[in-house]
C-alpha cells in the first residue's frame, strides 16, 4: 500500500489526532494527501488515485467518506475522534500499534451493503444517492402521527401510523433502527431491515428482508409534512403523495475492520451488549 488519502473532521481534536497518524504514515514511507472539505474531495479525486481512505473523526465523518469511496472501490479505515465510534473502530491511543497492521494489509477487508434511494415527487423521479446506514421518513416538528404506506416489490403490505419508518442496511442496524426496536444484523449480511418508528399498532413489527427486494414508502397523511433523512446527514421535505424508493446499491462500502477486535467484541464495548 503506497498512496493514502486522509479525510478528517474539521475539528481541533481531529487535527491533533492527524499528527499521530502522520507519524505512522511517514514511518512506513507512505505518500498521503489530507482533505477536510467533502465537495473539494469529490472534485479532485479520480479512480484508483489512492489505495486507502483513512478517516479521522466520528461515525458521521465515516458515513460521508463512504459515499465517496464506494464510487471508486477504495477501502476505508476509521480512526475515532468522535463520541461513539462504531464505524471508526481504531482509538487514537491504538494508532501506533494497530494502524500499521491495517496499512500493511494484515486486517480483514469487509464489503458492506449500501442502498440507493430515489424520490418521486410530482411525477418526477430523482436519484438521491447511495448510503451506508439508512433512509428515515419521520414526522415534522408538529407532534402528530404520520401515515405511510409500505410497498415491497410492488405489493402494498401495510400502512404505518406512527412517528415514521426506517429502511436500514445491516450496518445501520446498530444506529437509529436499533433505538427504534429493530434487531442487530451482522454487518456483512445481505439483508434490508424495515423498522416502524413508534407505531400506533402493536402488530407493526420490524421486518428483515432479502437485499434483492425493492421497498417503497408513500406518504399519505393529509395536511402533514414529513421529512426524509439519509444517513442522518442529508434531508428532504416530503408532502402527501411523495414516494421514497429504496433498493440495494450496485456500490458497496469496502472497509477494514479492527485487526484485534471482532464485531461482537465491539458490540460489547460500545453498546454493552451481552
From Swiss-Prot:
InterPro entries: ATP-NAD_kinase_N (IPR017438), ATP-NAD_kinase_PpnK-typ_C (IPR017437), NAD/diacylglycerol_kinase_sf (IPR016064), NADK (IPR002504). NAD(+) binds at residues 59-60, 133-134, 144, 163, 174-179, 233. One of its GO terms (biological process) is NADP biosynthetic process. Belongs to the NAD kinase family. It is found in: Cytoplasm. Transmembrane segments: none annotated. Keywords: ATP-binding, Cytoplasm, Kinase, NAD, NADP, Nucleotide-binding, Transferase. Its main location: cytoplasm. It comes from Aquifex aeolicus (strain VF5). It catalyses: NAD(+) + ATP = ADP + NADP(+) + H(+). SUPFAM superfamilies: NAD kinase/diacylglycerol kinase-like. HAMAP family: NAD_kinase (MF_00361). This is NAD kinase. The keyword Kinase applies. The active site is at 59 (proton acceptor). GO terms for cellular component: cytoplasm. Its EC number is 2.7.1.23. GO terms for molecular function: ATP binding; metal ion binding; NAD binding; NAD+ kinase activity. Involved in the regulation of the intracellular balance of NAD and NADP, and is a key enzyme in the biosynthesis of NADP. Catalyzes specifically the phosphorylation on 2'-hydroxyl of the adenosine moiety of NAD to yield NADP. Its cofactor is a divalent metal cation.
Amino acid at each position: 500500500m503506497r498512496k493514502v488519502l486522509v479525510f478528517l473532521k474539521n475539528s481541533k481534536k481531529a487535527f491533533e489526532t492527524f499528527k499521530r497518524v502522520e507519524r505512522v504514515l511517514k514511518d512506513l514511507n507512505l505518500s498521503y494527501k489530507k482533505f477536510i472539505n467533502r465537495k473539494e474531495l469529490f472534485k479532485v479525486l479520480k479512480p484508483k488515485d489512492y489505495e486507502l481512505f483513512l478517516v479521522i473523526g466520528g461515525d458521521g465523518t465515516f458515513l460521508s467518506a463512504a459515499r465517496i469511496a464506494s464510487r471508486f472501490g477504495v477501502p476505508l479505515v476509521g480512526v475515532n475522534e468522535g463520541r461513539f465510534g462504531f464505524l471508526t473502530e481504531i482509538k487514537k491511543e491504538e494508532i501506533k500499534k494497530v494502524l500499521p497492521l491495517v496499512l500493511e494489509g494484515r486486517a480483514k477487508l469487509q464489503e458492506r451493503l449500501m442502498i440507493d434511494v430515489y424520490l418521486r415527487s410530482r411525477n418526477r423521479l430523482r436519484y438521491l444517492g447511495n448510503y451506508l446506514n439508512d433512509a428515515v421518513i419521520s414526522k415534522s416538528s408538529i407532534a402528530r402521527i404520520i401515515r405511510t404506506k409500505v410497498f415491497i416489490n410492488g405489493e402494498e403490505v401495510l400502512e404505518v401510523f406512527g412517528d415514521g419508518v426506517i429502511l436500514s442496511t445491516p450496518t445501520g442496524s446498530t444506529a437509529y433502527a436499533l433505538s427504534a426496536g429493530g434487531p442487530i444484523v451482522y454487518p456483512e449480511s445481505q439483508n434490508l431491515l424495515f423498522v416502524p418508528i413508534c407505531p400506533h399498532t402493536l402488530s407493526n413489527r420490524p421486518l428483515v428482508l432479502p437485499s434483492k427486494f425493492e421497498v417503497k414508502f408513500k406518504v399519505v397523511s393529509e395536511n402533514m409534512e414529513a421529512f426524509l433523512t439519509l444517513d442522518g446527514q442529508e434531508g428532504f421535505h416530503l408532502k402527501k403523495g411523495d414516494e421514497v424508493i429504496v433498493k440495494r446499491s450496485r456500490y458497496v462500502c469496502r472497509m477494514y475492520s479492527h485487526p484485534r477486535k471482532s464485531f461482537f467484541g465491539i458490540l460489547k464495548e460500545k453498546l454493552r451488549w451481552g
